[in-house]
Amino acid sequence: MTNDADVALGIEAARRLAHLGLVDIQPGLTDAEFATIERRFGFEFADDHRAFLAAGLPVWTPGQDDHPDKASWGWPNWRQLDSSSTLHEQVDWPLATALDEIQHGEWPPGWSRRPHDLARRMAKAKRLLADVPRMVPVYGHRYLPAGRGSSGHPVLSIHRLTDTIVYGNDLAHYIDQEFREPRVTVPLWRDYV
């Protein structure tokens, strides 16, 4: 069951993004589109993420998405399910990078003992990862966990399994962190920021 506060958080994030005027925003996703996406990828959007995408589908940030160091993949265009290998790469990235690092020796601390045999290690990792919530792309390498009936999770920047940081306390805070330029008030120094 969806909570009004969860929906409000997603709508507030969408409002903040639209207010900045930096992004091409298409009409929001419909219930039928959500159902198709969720069936295709095997996850359900968290309630705040769903409300955000229902309010409007951000698809491009001129200037920001043109620079590979800033966004890499940019906004996922959930309407290009068949024509975009980029969307599939973006959705698959968290699991792919986790498995890649595990193959090269990394082992999450909470996962008991690491098998020495590579085949056993990878099989065990795949079993354990199957129980971890899927991460759903928000923008570039920024992700929220999947899960209908959940909301308010921190947005994570996932470049690698071992290079994961919190990029926003929640979706609305993330929009401010990623796209709103802070106003520097210190004389002299503000001219050099």
Predicted regions and their residues:
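Short, solvent-exposed polar/charged micro-motifs at secondary-structure junctions
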Residues: 58, 147-149
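A surface-exposed partner-binding patch
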Residues: 1-130, 136, 140
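Residues in flexible loops and secondary-structure boundaries
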Residues: 51-53, 146, 164
